[in-house]
């Protein structure tokens, strides 16, 4: 934490900032965002996992989500229910197969997720105003947070490496993984067109190399 605070203090006066210091973390599936988040958390950042927030919101609003998509699932012969509630793999297959269904899902769930994340940002800021807050959010470009981030760390990795990681982690057919990846082809261009200060960090096999690159980038910016 001392390294983060000293860097921040070198950039501005010792007075506590008047608003949260937000830094975005994004990138395509299985590029290494969670590893990057852990590295920066160890360095002293407060890290918010938007996926974890999303999963919690999904569970809390399963009934509404089921009502929204049950009819479309039945048309496609997809059973959304299992003994635990909504079958998340079946649900992902449904929404990622149709752009309009994905938009419908995001229109419902993203505002709720944003509200929950803002609550956590406010708590973290109240505890330690000078501490940078890292927002690990794959779809950061679809939220209002992007305009409030000082800069964005965009983690990328070779396609084949991401494919291997996804297959090992999710145990889905390659066709399903390919479909999900295809929906993310324009991720980086979204940040470019939003004029966001985006830093691409390449993540290959070595976590040590990723750590070196990440710390080099944040130190350049005084953290």
Swiss-Prot record:
Coiled coil location: none
Domain (DPCK): residue spans on this chain: 22-223
Gene Ontology MF term list: ATP binding; dephospho-CoA kinase activity
Keywords assigned: ATP-binding, Coenzyme A biosynthesis, Cytoplasm, Kinase, Nucleotide-binding, Transferase
UniProt pathway: Cofactor biosynthesis; coenzyme A biosynthesis; CoA from (R)-pantothenate: step 5/5
Protein's cellular compartments: Cytoplasm
Matching Pfam families: CoaE (PF01121)
Its EC number(s): 2.7.1.24
Gene3D superfamilies associated with the record: P-loop containing nucleotide triphosphate hydrolases
Keyword Transferase: yes
Listed transmembrane segments: none
Substrates-to-products reaction catalysed: 3'-dephospho-CoA + ATP = ADP + CoA + H(+)
Chain positions recorded as ATP binding sites: 30-35
Name the UniProt record assigns to this protein: Dephospho-CoA kinase
Record HAMAP family: Dephospho_CoA_kinase
Functional summary from the UniProt entry: Catalyzes the phosphorylation of the 3'-hydroxyl group of dephosphocoenzyme A to form coenzyme A.
Top class in the EC scheme: transferase
Origin superkingdom: Bacteria
GO annotation terms (biological process): coenzyme A biosynthetic process
Family according to the record: Belongs to the CoaE family.
Any one annotated GO CC term: cytoplasm
Main location per the UniProt record: cytoplasm
């Amino acid at each position: 934490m001392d390294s983060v605070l000293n860097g921040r203090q070198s950039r501005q006066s010792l007075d506590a900032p008047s608003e949260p210091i937000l830094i975005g973390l994004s990138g395509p599936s299985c590029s290494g965002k969670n590893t990057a988040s852990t590295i920066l958390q160890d360095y002293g950042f407060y890290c918010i996992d938007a996926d974890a927030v999303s999963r919690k919101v999904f569970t809390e609003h399963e009934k509404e989500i089921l009502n929204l998509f049950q009819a479309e699932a039945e048309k496609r012969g997809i059973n959304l229910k299992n003994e635990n509630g909504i079958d998340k793999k079946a649900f992902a297959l449904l929404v990622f197969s149709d752009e309009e269904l994905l938009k419908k899902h995001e229109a419902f769930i993203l505002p709720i997720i944003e509200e929950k994340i803002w609550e956590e940002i406010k708590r973290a800021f109240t505890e330690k105003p000078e501490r940078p807050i890292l927002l690990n959010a794959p779809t950061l470009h679809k939220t209002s947070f992007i305009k409030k981030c000082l800069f964005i760390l965009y983690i990328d990795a070779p396609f084949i490496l991401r494919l291997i990681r996804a297959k090992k982690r999710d145990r889905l057919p390659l066709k399903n993984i390919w479909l999900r990846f295809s929906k993310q082809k324009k991720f980086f261009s979204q940040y470019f067109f939003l004029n966001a200060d985006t830093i691409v960090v390449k993540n290959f096999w070595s976590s040590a190399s990723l750590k070196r690159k990440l710390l080099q980038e944040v130190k350049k910016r005084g953290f």
